[in-house]
């Protein structure tokens, strides 16, 4: 009997153990593996977190993919190459106890969740969607406790944008191929941005500089200072030429300079609001020299999660695609505690920031650190150089936004000489406030010396300076993003790709930091301005963005927007196709002769960049790459090392003496030899290292780039 009971007990234990091992887990689906890794560490063993690797369904690339006869119905297909990923998602979903869709908290993320729900046969009206503004343990666990249905307003807003862009791109691009050159394309928002850049270039070309003169005087008092002439008989003065300037100086030399009016004021400077996507892109360009693409790449890393020593995996910043400056009460309270503990009560103010734009999605916050106590310098060792720079920028801006104003003492003095009035100003910082953490490039304190009304001043010099009015500056990435935001063109997720797209299409080029339109860019925008005026009109583009926002909050039906747009657009297409004549592209002839037939080579544009082709085409089909020397001699033969491209378009560096010399490098060589083995050093940049490494695979020498 005892044996039977023991066997029975063992069977029960085995069955229980088997039941435990087959217990179903909850499945959480996110976009990226790094995000999955971070969230997986927060949720524990009862959850499995996997990544969809972005979109799984989209419009086909091979055709328009919009059923115009069926009220603009999108013809979605599974994205090519995602078959195995979709199989994995279906398998995991089928085996799961419950499925949560945790894609990003914006239109694009909502649309990805909707497509996933379709593929996994989930009901989008069921509470399957979880959202969080920051990837921290508390935020993620709270989101899992509060799932909601998929918001179809946001999905439809994304669908409307996608279909609009497809209608424009897949209709105008073939027209450009036929009339200008194959391979060209036109986008809705990008075309409006290109128009802005081209209009600025036209302003610069049409600008006629005007001469003007400035007169300044130096004075000796308790401290030397300078004043500038700005009034004549109480009116603003304009000095147009040298003769007028000389006459004024002659008059000034006949009279005394007398202090006429002194005003002293206390002025305050307010801290800036926390970053939006746009202001982060602008500041990172101006302060740490990141372009918009790099800014968003690094910001995405900070958002999705970084392994911090002593803390673990954590998303360091809140969601990075936002046009809101609002901050949650919890984040403001955390900032208050930090400021009081580290700087004192006199530095805390607790500012609230209202969104300036009515379209701002108030469900989002401004960009901020997820944990204000993770001070940039304290976690620097856990971050790459670029991550540290950007995190410090975000952290400083947020903490400063909750601090008191900076206070200045301002003094201004009018100095009179006959009918002429000079103005001198000075200021001094008397309380730093938010500047304690958010340093700004400002002139050093320049207080005026003690002055009294009626005081005669000793003149040390009178200086005349010839000047000319300057044309408007070309756009930089930062100033273009600022202008796009001011004109309400695009949204946080669209700013970064715009410049890259226009450069890839060869519509603009970089000149140092400036953006300059190419001849091709002008050709395309002139055609579009004539035949598709609305597409390139900034007001029309801004109004369309507002309509898309209305779709997002379910005020407007997304199909109504498409119907209103496509009718007139279809007629414009017909007119353009009839009236635009074929434009013969100008060919740039070089002084390089073809080694096969002796004719001159011409510069051509290809998929992987510029190359040389024989002008005798099609009789002679000789082509060769354009050689760009990097200024480093080949260690084998002494000839120049040049930049080259592989068949797949990847850049590498090889000897210009090829095929006689086959020396080549994947990393860019520098004109410096390894102190250990004598081989050339090459540039290398990874998440954890930026500097020079030895090109000899058997040598481990490396040196970091000094910051």
Predicted regions and their residues:
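Alpha-helical scaffold elements adjacent to nucleotide-binding pockets in ATP/GTP-utilizing enzyme cores
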Residues: 38-42, 88, 111-119, 139-143, ...
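Core structural elements
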Residues: 161-171, 217-219, 267-279, 297-311, ...
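Basic, low-complexity terminal or inter-domain segments flanking catalytic cores
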Residues: 4-5, 10-27, 38, 45-47, ...
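Conserved short loop/turn motifs at secondary-structure junctions
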Residues: 24, 104-105, 181-185, 264-273, ...
């Amino acid at each position: 009997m005892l044996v039977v009971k023991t066997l029975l007990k063992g069977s029960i234990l085995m069955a229980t153990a088997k039941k435990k091992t087959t217990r179903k887990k909850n499945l959480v689906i996110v976009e990226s593996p790094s995000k999955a890794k971070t969230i997986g560490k927060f949720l524990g063993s009862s959850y499995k977190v996997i990544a969809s690797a972005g979109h799984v369904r989209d419009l086909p690339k091979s055709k328009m993919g919009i059923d115009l006869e069926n009220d603009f119905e999108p013809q979605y297909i599974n994205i090519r190459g995602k078959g195995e990923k979709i199989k994995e998602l279906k398998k995991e979903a089928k085996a799961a106890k419950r499925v949560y869709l945790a894609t990003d908290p914006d239109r694009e993320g909502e649309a990805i969740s909707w497509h996933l729900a379709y593929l996994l046969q989930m009901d989008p009206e069921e509470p399957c969607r979880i959202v969080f503004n920051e990837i921290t343990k508390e935020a993620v666990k709270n989101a899992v406790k509060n799932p909601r249905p998929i918001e179809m307003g946001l999905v439809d807003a994304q669908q409307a944008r996608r279909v609009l862009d497809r209608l424009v791109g897949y209709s105008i691009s073939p027209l450009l191929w036929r009339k200008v050159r194959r391979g060209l394309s036109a986008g809705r928002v990008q075309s409006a941005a290109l128009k802005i850049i081209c209009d600025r270039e036209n302003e610069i070309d049409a600008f006629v500089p005007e001469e003007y003169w400035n007169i300044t005087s130096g004075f000796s008092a308790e401290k030397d200072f300078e004043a500038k002439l700005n009034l004549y008989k109480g009116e603003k003065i304009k000095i147009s030429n040298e003769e007028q300037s000389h006459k004024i100086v002659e008059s000034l030399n006949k009279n005394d300079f007398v202090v006429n009016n002194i005003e002293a004021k206390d002025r305050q400077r307010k801290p800036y609001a926390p970053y939006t996507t746009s202001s982060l892109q602008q500041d990172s360009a101006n302060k740490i020299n990141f372009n918009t693409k790099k800014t968003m790449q690094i910001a995405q890393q900070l958002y999705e999660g970084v392994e911090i020593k002593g803390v673990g995996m954590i998303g360091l910043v809140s969601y990075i695609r936002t046009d809101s400056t609002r901050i949650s009460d919890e984040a403001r309270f955390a900032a208050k505690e930090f400021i009081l503990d580290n700087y004192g009560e006199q530095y805390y103010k607790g500012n609230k920031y209202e969104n300036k734009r009515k379209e701002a999605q108030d469900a989002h916050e401004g960009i901020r650190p997820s944990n204000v106590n993770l001070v940039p310098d304290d976690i620097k060792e856990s971050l790459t150089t670029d991550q540290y720079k950007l995190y410090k920028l975000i952290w400083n801006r947020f903490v400063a936004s909750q601090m008191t104003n900076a206070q200045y003492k301002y003094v201004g003095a009018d100095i009179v000489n006959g009918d002429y009035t000079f103005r001198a100003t000075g200021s001094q910082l008397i309380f730093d406030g938010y500047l304690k953490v958010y340093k700004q490039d400002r002139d050093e304190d320049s207080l005026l010396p003690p002055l009294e009304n009626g005081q005669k001043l000793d003149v040390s010099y009178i200086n005349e300076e010839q000047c000319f009015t300057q044309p408007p500056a070309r756009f930089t990435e930062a100033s273009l993003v600022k202008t796009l935001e001011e004109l309400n063109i695009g949204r946080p997720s669209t700013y970064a790709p715009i410049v890259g797209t226009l450069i890839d299409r060869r519509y603009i080029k970089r000149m140092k930091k400036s953006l300059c339109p190419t001849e091709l860019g002008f050709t395309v925008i002139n055609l579009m301005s004539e035949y598709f005026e609305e597409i390139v009109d900034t007001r029309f583009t801004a109004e369309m963005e507002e309509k898309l926002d209305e779709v997002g909050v379910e005020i407007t039906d997304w199909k109504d927007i498409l119907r209103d747009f496509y009718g007139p657009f279809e007629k414009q297409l017909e007119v353009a196709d009839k009236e635009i004549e074929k434009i013969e592209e100008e060919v740039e002839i070089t002084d390089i002769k073809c080694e096969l037939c002796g004719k001159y080579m011409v510069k051509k544009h290809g998929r992987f960049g510029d190359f040389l082709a024989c002008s005798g085409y099609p009789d002679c089909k000789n082509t060769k790459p354009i050689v760009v020397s990097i200024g480093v001699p080949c260690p084998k033969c002494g000839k120049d090392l040049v930049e080259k491209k592989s068949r797949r378009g990847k850049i590498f560096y090889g000897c210009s003496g090829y095929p006689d010399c086959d020396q080549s490098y994947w990393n860019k060589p520098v004109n410096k030899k390894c102190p250990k083995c004598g081989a050339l050093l090459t540039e290398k940049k990874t998440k954890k290292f930026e500097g020079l490494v030895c090109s000899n695979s058997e040598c481990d020498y490396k040196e970091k780039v000094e910051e």
